[in-house]
Amino acid sequence: MTISGLLERWAGQHPETGFLTYCENGAWKTRSYGETLKGVREVAEGYGRRFGMTPREENAAIILANSPEWIESYLAQTGAGAAVVPIDPKLHNDEVEYILKDAEVRVVTTDTRHLKMMMTIAKRLPCLRGVVVVGGVINEGQKIDGRVDVVGYESLRIAGGGAWYDAHHAKPEDIASIIYTSGTTGKPKGAMLRHSNFVKDLEGAFEVFGAEVGPSDSFFVVLPLFHAFSFSANFIASMMKGASMCFCQSLRTVGQDIHDLKPTVICGVPLLAEKLHAKIESGLQKSRLARFLLKIGLRGPVMHMVKMKLGGRLRFFITGGAPCPRPVMECFRRLHVRFLEGYGLTECSPIVSVCPPEVLKIGTIGPAIAGIEVRLADKNESGVGEIQVKGPIVMQGYFHNPDATAEAFEDDGSGGLWFRTGDLGSMDEDGFITIRGRKKALIVNREGKNIYPEEVENTIAKAPCVADVVVIGYTQGGDPGEKVGAIVYPNEDWYRDSNGGKLPSREEIDKDLVKSVHEKCSELADYKRVRKVVVAKEPLERTSIGKVRRVAYKGTLDE
C-alpha cells in the first residue's frame, strides 16, 4: 500500500465522507475524500505536463503552512512517483537554500510570502526548474534567473486530468519523503522514507490502540505537517482509518477551534497539553459555580462542563517528543480522555513505541509497536543502554550522505542493521521503555557518574515559578569532568498572580527563582544537583514543535 493508495481506497468506498476541514475567509469548509482525490489527480496532471518530472529520479519540495494545498500537492507529487521534501516555512533563507541544494529539488511549492526568498536563492540552485505559488496574484510568465518558471498553483489544475497520475503511479518501495532532521549536531541530513515505511509504521501503531479509531473520528491538526510526527499521526493515520482532519487556524485560536470543531483525537507535544491544562485550571478557579460544585464533592458536572469546552467528543490525546507532567495526564484522564505518550524519530517514520490505552504506566513511553524490534545496546549496571531499532519502519538512509548513513547503523553480525537512535533508555519486564536522555546530552562528573539532564529538568519544572528550563554540563577551569548547570526562565504569570496582580521586580524574581531551583534539586541525589543557575532574560529558544533547543546553550556556562 502507498500513501496515495490510502486516499484512493477511501475515496472509492466512501467518496462523500469529509476528509479535510479548514478555515477560509472566516468560514469553516470541508472537502470530501472524493473531492480531494479529484483535486490530487488534476494537480498531478499539471505538475507532470508543466515540469515533466522523472518519477523516482527527481525531488520536489513543499514550503507551506498546514492547508488543503499542502495535502493536495504532496499527494499529487508522491502519488505520481516523486519524492517530496517538506520544509519548515519558518527556516531562514540560508537553511532553506541548503536543503533545496542538498536534495537537488526540481520544483518548489510555496506561498507568496516565500516567493521573494525563492527569487533570491534560486540563482544558487542549479537543479531548480520551477516555483509553484499558492494564493495571491503573480506574473505567470516570469522566470527567475532566466530559467526557473514561476507558476500559480491553480493554473496547474487541469480539469478532468489524471493520466499522468495513473501512468506514473507510486509503488510501496518508492521514496515518498526526504525529511531533513533539525541539524542540532551539524548540518541537517535528509532521511529517505518509503511509502511502505510510513504505512507499516501506522499499521504497527494502530495494533496498540487503533481498533477504536474509525471513520467517525476527527484528528485536530495543530502541529505542522512538515514534522514527521504530525505527518504520520494526523495525515496518514486519518487516511488509514477513513477519518477526517481539521486544521486549527493558529496557535492563538487553539482553544476556540477545539470547541468549534469538536475533534476526537489530538496529536501534539506536551507543551500543547500543558497549555490546555493551564487554561482548564484557570477557568475552574474563575468559575464560582465550578468552585462550589467541587467544594461539595460534585466533580462529575464540573468535568462535563470542562469536556464540553473541549468540544465534547475528545477521546484521545497523544503526545511525543518530551515527557508530559503527571498532573496534566491525570487531568485529561479525569475527563475520560485517554492520554497516551509515545516515542519516535524521523528516521523511524517516526513512531517507535506508544503506551496502550488500557495500561497505565506513567513515565514510560510504552512497548515497541507491532512489527519491529527494539533493543538496548551497551547497557550499564543500571540497565540503561542506547535504544536501537530494526524493522520495516526504518529509513533507507540519508540522501547523498553515505558516511552519515553508515554511522547511523550498527551491524549485529548476522547481516541485520540496527538504527542507532542516540537516545538512552531502560526497559521493564513487560517491554515498556523509559527514556533516560540523549546520549550526547549526558553529563559525566569528575567521579565518572552519569547525570541525565532530562531527569534534573523534570524535577526543576515541577516548581510553578519556572516556565522554561534547560540543564547542561559545564566545565570550570581545568577541573576534570562536568558540573550540572541550569538556565531557567520565570513563569511571569505565576509571579503576577502570587503578588496580587503585580509583577515583582526583576531582582526579586531572579533571587526567588534561583532559590526555588535549588530547593527542588534537594529532592535529587547530591551528585545530580545543580551547581550553577542562570536566569535567562528571554524565553528559551525552542524548535518548531516546542522542544527547548539544547544545542543553543551548550558551552554557555563554561568558566
Over which residues does each language-model region extend?
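Conserved pre-ATP/AMP-binding loop-to-beta segment of ANL
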Residues: 15-18, 148-151, 158-180, 187, ...
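Conserved AMP-binding/adenylate-forming core of the ANL superfamily
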Residues: 19-54, 58-67, 71-75, 92-97, ...
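Conserved AMP-binding A3 loop
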Residues: 30-34, 176-202
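Structural core segment of the AMP-binding/adenylate-forming
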Residues: 79-155, 482
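Conserved ATP-dependent adenylate/AMP-binding module captured primarily in the ANL superfamily
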Residues: 89-124, 201-220, 251-265
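Conserved AMP-binding/adenylation subdomain of ANL enzymes
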Residues: 199-218, 225-305, 313, 338
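Conserved ATP-binding/catalytic segment of the ANL
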Residues: 375, 382-445, 453, 462, ...
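Conserved C-terminal "lid"/linker of ANL adenylate-forming enzymes
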Residues: 468-473, 515-559
